[in-house]
Amino acid sequence: MARKKGGSGAKNGRDSNPKYLGVKVYGGTEVSAGSILVRQRGTSIHPGNNVGCGKDYTLFAKADGVVTYHERKGRKLASIEAK
């Protein structure tokens, strides 16, 4: 029998890197095409007019304009009102 306990005594002390999720541009703000509007896990906010959705569900502007957030059929949408 070993006199001392094997290595790995500490079970805590780990933490994941921050993911910086959330709304990056709020309603009423003017944006240019390609601007990131929302970073999210899954589609809690869906893309509306002139808004695209990346493979990691990031919403981005497809055209220059003003950002609006609204609800349709119980679903939150982000849209761009083009200039």
UniProtKB/Swiss-Prot annotation:
Record's keyword annotation contains Ribonucleoprotein: yes
Any GO BP annotation: translation
GO molecular function, one term: structural constituent of ribosome
InterPro entries assigned: Ribosomal_bL27, Ribosomal_bL27_CS
Record keywords: Ribonucleoprotein, Ribosomal protein
One GO CC annotation: cytosolic large ribosomal subunit
Protein name (Swiss-Prot/TrEMBL): Large ribosomal subunit protein bL27
Source species of the chain: Treponema denticola (strain ATCC 35405 / DSM 14222 / CIP 103919 / JCM 8153 / KCTC 15104)
